[in-house]
């Protein structure tokens, strides 16, 4: 914020494109660029000497909280997910602004962690729309009974973004918190806690409606979405859990994040 308005507007794109925009390609290139500028163009010493990291930290913190609050106001499911993306990108920026090795590691890890969780949620939103023709949260009453696998994956993705263990979102946020304490900063930890609660706040009503509110009679004619949609959803949801339990499995996320962080702070030594 305040350069975010294009991102919620981009959610009108088809679901695969939305997932690509919000979870993998476009937005992540921006935050990775910030990491490169902080680490290599300015360097941690210059960032600290001129208090540039403090300015960046304030911007990231405000964006995290404000984007979460704006997500509460969105009835359109994909639009709520879009504001969630705005907030979670700022976790990555916050990691860079901490200019501590563990903070930077946590921010870099959140690039990958957010990708699996947010792809899961956007795929779920797409499956709901294709299968039930519903896109507003207020219309999702009782859908877990007809789409149990889709909503189960949605719960996993939501819990991960809220930072609930043992999902990968908890791991990256844990390193962000430890990195904050490493630098003697408590306010970023407070921001992480508050934003985690806000994440629960704007995801829980969706889950509550789906599982505990009675749906309309029109749901009786529907079943679970096509396996061509459900299988990718379950794969990304399971990856969110697996990479939470084993961050270095397959792609060595923690090892790569630590290596990049060490390169920035130690010049590759």
Positions of PLM-derived features:
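Hydrophobic transmembrane alpha-helices and their helix-loop junctions in integral membrane proteins
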Residues: 1-209
């Amino acid at each position: 914020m305040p350069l975010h308005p294009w991102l919620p507007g981009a959610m009108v794109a088809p679901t695969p494109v939305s997932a690509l925009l919000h979870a993998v390609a476009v937005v992540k290139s921006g935050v990775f660029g910030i990491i490169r500028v902080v680490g290599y163009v300015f360097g941690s010493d210059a960032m600290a000497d001129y208090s540039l990291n403090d300015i960046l930290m304030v911007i990231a913190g405000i964006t995290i909280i404000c984007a979460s609050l704006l997500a509460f106001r969105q009835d359109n499911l994909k639009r709520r997910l879009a504001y969630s993306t705005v907030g979670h990108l700022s976790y990555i920026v916050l990691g860079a602004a901490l200019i501590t090795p563990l903070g930077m590691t946590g921010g870099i890890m959140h690039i990958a962690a957010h990708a699996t969780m947010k792809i899961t949620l956007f795929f779920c939103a797409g499956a709901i729309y294709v299968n039930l023709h519903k896109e507003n949260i207020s219309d999702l009453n009782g859908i877990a009974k007809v789409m149990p696998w889709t909503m189960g994956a949605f719960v996993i993705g939501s819990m991960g973004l809220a930072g609930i263990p043992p999902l990968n979102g908890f791991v990256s946020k844990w390193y962000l918190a430890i990195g904050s304490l490493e630098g003697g900063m408590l306010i970023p930890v407070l921001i992480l806690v508050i934003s985690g609660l806000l994440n629960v706040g704007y995801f829980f009503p969706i889950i509550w409606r789906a599982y505990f509110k009675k749906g309309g009679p029109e749901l009786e004619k529907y079943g679970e979405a096509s396996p061509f949609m459900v299988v990718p959803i379950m794969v990304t949801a399971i990856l969110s859990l697996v990479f939470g339990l084993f961050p270095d499995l397959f792609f060595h996320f923690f090892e790569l994040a630590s290596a990049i962080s060490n390169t920035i702070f130690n010049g590759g030594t």
